[in-house]
């Protein structure tokens, strides 16, 4: 009964990213064929390699879809073998920020985040987060969507968000924190 209910909830998930409904989970340092690794930062909680409390995730893109692979640890639980919802929301927010950046060549701050939790995320269970830009309103507001799925392809959470582009001064400051080619995100000449 529980498995049937979970499948029904997964099928009812509204955010299907790209054309794939089932994701192959990849948990390594190299991108999946057709995907390119994006730069990362030193300080970010999600992708910062020098942040001792951070997740140290890497993001990859095909130029439209952005994805990352994550295996939550035991210390990420909020309640008995269930990863904290705030961490899941953080991951979905970050993937949408990157999706907006890849498409618009501008980073942004979250103005609104809506998360739908469909099923529990368990520690040590590999998951894939994917996101994409849905609309760009004259470079003043970006709308994106994201999903989190397990290795079996079941949707565990979906999200939508609205994002406000950062200022040029903030972007200039941000570039100094990047590791890798920031031109992939900010455009040539950065």
Each language-model region and where it sits:
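Conserved active-site segments centered on acidic
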Residues: 92
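A generic structural signal for short beta-strands and their flanking turns/coil linkers
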Residues: 40-41, 53-55, 64-66, 109-113, ...
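Catalytic strand-loop segment that frames the active site of acyl-thioester-processing enzymes
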Residues: 40-83
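Hydrophobic residues in beta-strands and at strand termini
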Residues: 70-72, 117, 165
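Hydrophobic beta-strand-centered segment that forms part of the acyl-chain substrate-binding groove
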Residues: 95-133, 141, 160
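Active-site region of the double-stranded beta-helix
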Residues: 86
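HotDog/MaoC-like acyl-thioester-processing domains
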Residues: 3-9, 13-35, 121-123, 134-190
């Amino acid at each position: 009964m529980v498995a049937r209910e979970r499948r029904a909830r997964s099928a009812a998930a509204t955010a299907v990213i790209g054309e794939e409904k089932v994701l192959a989970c990849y948990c390594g340092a190299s991108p999946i064929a057709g995907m390119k690794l994006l730069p990362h930062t030193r300080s970010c909680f999600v992708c910062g390699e020098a942040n001792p409390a951070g997740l140290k995730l890497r993001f990859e893109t095909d130029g439209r879809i952005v994805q990352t692979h994550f295996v939550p640890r035991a210390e990420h639980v909020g309640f008995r073998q269930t990863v904290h919802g705030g961490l899941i929301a953080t991951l979905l927010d970050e993937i949408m920020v990157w999706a907006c950046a890849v498409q618009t060549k501008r980073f942004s701050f979250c103005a609104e985040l809506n998360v739908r939790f469909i099923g529990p995320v368990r520690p040590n269970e590999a998951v894939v987060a994917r996101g994409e830009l849905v609309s760009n309103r004259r470079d003043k507001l970006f709308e994106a969507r994201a999903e989190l799925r397990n290795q079996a392809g079941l949707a565990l959470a979906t999200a939508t968000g609205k994002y406000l582009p950062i200022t040029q001064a903030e972007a200039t400051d941000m570039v100094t924190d990047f590791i890798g080619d920031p031109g992939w995100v900010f455009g040539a000449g950065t």
